[in-house]
Amino acid sequence: MTEQVIGANSVPGIIAPDNVHVIQPSNPVASGNHLQPSEVTTYPISPKVIHCDTGRANLQNLLVVNQNSAAGVQSQPIGYQRQYPVGTASLQTVPGVIQYTQGTTNLQTWPGDLQNPLNANPGLTHTSNSSQWNTSFASFTSFNPKKFINEEVRTLGAIQILIGLTHIFSAINPVLYYYPFVTWLSGYPLWGGLSYIVSGSLSVWAAKDPSPCVVNSSISFNIISALFAFAGIFIIITDLSLYYVTTYSKAVSGGLLPFALLEFILTCVVSHFGCQATCCRQFENVAVIPTVFSFNPANTTTSPVNATTGPVNAATGPVSATNGPVNTTIHPVNTTTSPVNTTTSPVNVTTGPVNANIGPVNVTTGPVNTTTAPAKATTSCVNAIHTSNVPPNPRTKK
């Protein structure tokens, strides 16, 4: 049986038929491959591949890598290469380090890099501050508006009712009709007194039944009464400043002025603390818990260097131990047999160098069977080229 030896670097002397398509390999065999054992082949690889062996790949960028540990920070010099067991891969990229082991993943980034996203390894670990506390409105101020509404609003409402009755009794005084003045002409004692009575009644009702509807109604009417009291103060001061008003009329207006001032103050106080109590009720059960989360420096899911979807991926990346350009199983130069592929027959569509699937020379099945004789005729030329380019392997048969 004649054995045919074809070099993978270049075969310029082969005479092939017209229907044979020759494809040059993308990664030529480095010079000196005849000195390697028959089971290992050396390739001219990119700077990111330090060493390629069967079942192992070590991919790293040549720069200093810092690794954080519990004891301290360890730095690795430029070009440092760690040895990993067969079946594992070590990928080192910028700005982090990916170290793959069987069943575990450890991602480490540069210390102090604030732009890198934080990462939990192996899971989220949070450390709560020792000063966890549950607070309400009473924690911020010593005054409780809800307690004020429950205890004091009833008294303030009763005072408002009395002030309103005082204004109404002043409005029905028959003496005022003989001496007309501004307070009487404006009708302030009547509509002011009614407003004060309504707001005071709602305040007393809100103290007994603090439902949202009643409380909101009481706050609204107290705001309206405050506006009426302010208007009444302005009317009374105007009446007291006129010179033609009689002394009796000024006495009546002067008697209403303190009540108007008191009503204005009471309605403002009740409205303010009523609104504050309503807002406090909405946030009464809110717990304020200051929590500090502590993370490991890198993120296994969202980091730019991701073991599954990141730019440096051991399964689908351009430098892959299974289907990348540096492939130990389906590369044009097969590493499992020998750097120089030896065939058992001149033309073999399955294991020979003229292979339509994995061989460096792409030949279709039909034309190869019809051109057996020309392929045998070029055996001597192939051997001559092999002698000039690549020295024959002592283990091959002649």
UniProtKB/Swiss-Prot annotation:
GO terms for cellular component: plasma membrane. The keyword Transmembrane helix applies. The keyword Transcription regulation does not apply. Keywords: Membrane, Transmembrane, Transmembrane helix. It is found in: Membrane. Pfam families: CD20. It is a multi-pass membrane protein. InterPro entries: CD20-like (IPR007237), MS4A (IPR030417). Residues 332-346 have a biased composition (Low complexity). Coiled coil: none annotated. Signal peptide: none annotated. Residues 316-346 are annotated as: Disordered. It comes from the Eukaryota. One of its GO terms (biological process) is cell surface receptor signaling pathway. The chain crosses the membrane at residues 156-176, 178-198, 218-238, 251-271. Residues 319-331 have a biased composition (Polar residues). Belongs to the MS4A family. This is Membrane-spanning 4-domains subfamily A member 18. It comes from Homo sapiens (Human).
